[in-house]
A protein has these predicted regions:
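Conserved small/polar residues in nucleotide/adenosyl-binding loops
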Residues: 176-184
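Conserved beta-strand signature within the Rossmann-like core of class I S-adenosyl-L-methionine
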Residues: 156-163
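Conserved S-adenosyl-L-methionine
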Residues: 31
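Conserved SAM-binding loop of SAM-dependent methyltransferases across substrates and taxa
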Residues: 36-48
Length: 184
């Protein structure tokens, strides 16, 4: 979803973070659901840095979706939006309609159970990806989560959210707004 945002991540944000912090970025995919996002992130990072340097922490509160994420098996609808190069390089066909993600990519992602409203957050993160979940939170809960994300990030780190999410009062929690532009 949102190819323009992923393009901005790949072409602008990641090169900036790598130039500031080196190839071993600490990346957290919060509310990762079935793992589509952290695995996609690992594939994008693999274009920029050696795979051995990629370590993504991926959290969700639902143990069942985390088990699905760890399995790394997806239907063709889940992978059809990925670039062909990623489909060919990182997926193995299983039967007629399913694809298994490569072990190389699976090794880049560590899945853990975590509740954004209750559990401690990782610290020292260079990049936090949290898309399309906070829209379901109350304004008070969003404010709390954004403040905790800010404390989890290193100075000049990046919080990457979905284009449906607005951080009201982002300056109050020391965020600088970067907008991804639609590309044709």
């Amino acid at each position: 979803r949102n190819p323009n945002l992923w393009k901005t991540l790949e072409d602008v944000i990641l090169p900036d973070l790598i130039s500031k912090f080196g190839p071993r970025l600490k990346v957290w995919s919060a509310a990762c659901s079935t793992g589509d996002e952290p695995y996609s992130l690992a594939m994008v990072l693999a274009k920029k840095v050696p795979m051995r340097d990629i370590k993504i922490i991926a959290t969700d509160l639902d143990e069942q979706v985390l088990e699905k994420a760890k399995d790394g098996v997806y239907g063709e609808n889940s992978i059809k939006g990925l670039p062909k190069e990623f489909q060919d390089k990182y997926f193995e066909k299983m039967g007629d309609r399913f694809y298994k993600i490569s072990d190389d990519i699976k090794r880049c992602v560590e899945f853990k159970k975590s509740n954004l409203l209750k559990d401690p957050y990782p610290t020292g993160c260079h990049l936090i990806v949290c898309r399309n979940v906070l829209i379901y939170f109350t304004e008070e809960a969003k404010k709390d989560v954004y403040e905790k994300f800010n404390k989890s990030l290193v100075t000049d780190g990046c919080l990457f959210v979905g284009n449906t999410e607005q951080i009201i009062g982002y300056r109050a929690v020391s965020y600088t707004h970067l907008r991804a532009h639609e590309t044709t």
